[in-house]
Amino acid sequence: MKPIKKRFVPLVLCLPVAAALLSAPPVHAAHGAVVRVTLTSVWATPSPDPMGITYDPRTKRLLISDSEVDEMPGLWKGRNLFVVRRKGNLASSRTLKKFTVEPEDLAMDNRHRSLYVTDDDLDRVFKDKAGKDGLFGTRDDVAVTVLHTRRFGSFDPEGLTWLPQKKMLIVSDSTTRRIYKIRRGRDRKFGTRDDVIGSFGTYRYGFTTAEDVVATRFTHHLLIVSSRQRFILETTMKGALVRKIDLTGLGVKAASGITFAPGTDGSKSRLYLTDSGVDNNINPGENDGRLFELKIVP
């Protein structure tokens, strides 16, 4: 995660805008309820700042990335990819460091057994192809760059999701608070001149950061999380507001990643949310990462 730059604006202009933007969720909002909380900080190989998250349906495991652990000498064991059971137990810890030590987010392409990975230091999206072992984060992985996000104005790409039906990558930029939708052109390759790119902003809905994004399976609505706001923003693919899902009172400190996966309570689908807690730039010794399993209550 890139350090936050301080900006000073006249207070007389800032207060009315902030009041309007950061007000409570509207009447049509839903709220989240906790199903389970896991302390990623107490794993045998800890994840102090879990950031990215996706679900691997083939192994029925969550994959979680930590982009900050390499900055903590006391905790860094060369592992920044964590394979996790849905109940929160660590199955194994692996590494993506041969192509990134800053894996901000993950998105699964199960059909092609590939993992998309964002890096907000290099401003790239990588595609990591599993080798013969079928596993991610092992020696036989083959990783290539598929997007240089600066090409379309994203200098802080943090969130990522893959829509197989639309063959679309969606990137959330934490600094611009914009959601970028990228589709391949006629050459059927990402990162070339004929890519079709669209975007919309989230600041108008009260977000001051946009950490991650995931798409619903049937409606293709987008769920977006912020490390500073205590709600999940749901929009249409074009950016129209659907609702805000209130997270107040759940104990989430800094939402960093979001994905769907089967619930531990028998539900076909629950939200899994990573919480990076206190920023290691503020407290270099922090180790307070958590994983939330949530249900949405209308």
Give names to the regions the model predicted.
Residues H28-P298:
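Sequence/structural signature of beta-propeller domains
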Residues M1-K2, R36:
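Compositionally biased, low-complexity segments enriched in small residues
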Residues K2-L13:
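Bacterial N-terminal signal peptides that target proteins for export
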Residues V12-A20:
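Bacterial N-terminal signal peptides
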